[in-house]
Regions:
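Alpha-helical transmembrane segments
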Residues: 1-30, 54-82, 161-290, 294-353
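Membrane-embedded alpha-helical core segments of multi-pass
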Residues: 81-85, 103, 107-118, 139-149, ...
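Membrane interface segments of multi-pass transport proteins and intramembrane proteases
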Residues: 30, 91-93, 122-131, 292, ...
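Hydrophobic alpha-helical hairpins/lids featuring a short glycine-rich hinge
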Residues: 76-106
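Juxtamembrane helix-capping/reentrant segments at transmembrane boundaries
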Residues: 34-46, 207
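Transmembrane alpha-helix boundary signature
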Residues: 59-71, 89-95, 112-126, 232-236
Length: 353
């Protein structure tokens, strides 16, 4: 237990102390995220906060993970280094989406093939239980890539990605602690510690953004935690801490980044545009357009994510597929209401102007 507390504190302190120096260097070198029509900030802001998150997380994990628990952690750290390099390069000198995707694919491949972060069962969704080897590899890599990029996509307003990432890491970290998987819990709480420290500098008015360096790392950590959460239910059996619908519970815990990505991609396709074409259709953009401030929108979405965690924990007994349909339905209704409010607010502003 003390390893986990120390991992959190170490990551928090290192990131908290490192961020001011990162801000200073970014300003001297003019490494800013510039405002644009698609972005929600209006002043040039340093965007290398992810360096502090990475440093705090990795240092703390290496320092406090007991050697006998180290396991496949070396491969996970290798994947994180690749993700860090991709993010840092993109924050300093933007790279093409294809190059970024290839880098993410390499990192995902390391996690699946070397660290064995792999989905092997759908727990009865659509009647599917055990997944064949090739399908398991494909699904696992796809899941990792989706979660990584979903965090990148929600990193659009102050505090959002860091708040949601911290919530997910702590929620899953507590579960890993309860089933005595100390090494995974340390990773979760170290990530939460560094991310919460970063939040101090990211609340409005934001002194720094996490950039791709931070959002891609957060997505990587959460993808690992989510897949291991699902997979370890094959091992813990009738443990009092086992959930009846693990895949749906995991989806509910990650509901905000996953559903927002799914909703935006579907919307773009129906509008005849590429699903990767950037716009202001994300849930956080709709909240801002409806009149909320950055921190109000972030707090609201954090509460909504907590609500979904409560729902999936309480209703886990209704079955994996039923629970998945329920949370998708609730999320769809809530986002439709929000879209309606934002649309009316926008029309009202246009009429007044």
């Amino acid at each position: 237990m003390y390893h986990i507390i120390l991992a959190f504190i170490t990551a928090f302190l290192l990131t908290y102390l490192a961020i001011p120096s990162i801000i200073s260097v970014a300003k001297k070198k003019k490494l800013f995220d510039e405002p644009s029509d698609r972005k929600s900030h209006i002043v040039s802001t340093p965007s290398l906060g992810g360096i502090g998150i990475f440093a705090g997380t990795i240092f703390s994990v290496i320092l406090w993970t007991p050697f006998n628990f180290f396991g496949d952690l070396q491969y996970i750290l290798c994947a994180f280094i690749i993700i860090f390099l991709i993010g840092a390069k993109d924050d300093i000198d933007p790279i093409s989406p294809m190059k970024k995707f290839i880098g993410e694919l390499v990192a995902a491949g390391i996690l699946v093939f070397k660290a064995n972060i792999r989905l092997t069962s759908l727990y009865g969704i659509l009647g599917i239980y055990e997944i064949p080897g090739w399908a398991s590899i494909t699904l696992s890599i796809f899941t990792i890539l989706v979660i990584i990029n979903s965090f990148n996509l929600i990193d659009g307003i102050n505090g959002l990605s860091a708040s949601i990432g911290s919530l997910i890491a702590i929620t899953l970290g507590v579960w890993f602690l309860m089933i005595d998987r100390i090494e995974i819990a340390i990773l979760a709480f170290a990530t939460a510690g560094s991310t919460i420290a970063f939040l101090k500098y990211n609340i409005t008015p934001a002194k720094i953004f996490m950039g791709d360096t931070g959002s891609l790392l957060l997505g990587s950590v959460c993808s690992i935690l989510a897949i291991l959460f699902i997979e370890l239910h094959n091992i813990i059996g009738d443990s009092p801490y086992a959930f009846k619908a693990a895949p749906s519970v995991a989806f509910g815990i990650l509901i905000l980044p996953l559903f927002d990505t799914l909703r935006v991609f579907i919307t773009r396709v129906f509008q005849g545009r590429s699903p990767f074409h950037p716009d202001r259709q994300h849930i956080h953009h709709l909240l801002i357009d409806s009149g909320l401030t950055h921190m109000q929108a972030t707090f609201m979405l954090l509460v909504v994510n907590c609500f979904f965690i409560f729902i999936v924990v309480k209703l886990q007994n209704i079955g994996t597929l039923n629970l998945l349909i329920l949370i998708l339905g609730i999320a769809a209704i809530l986002s439709t209401i929000l879209l309606f409010i934002a649309s009316n607010k926008k029309k009202y502003k246009e009429v007044r102007s």
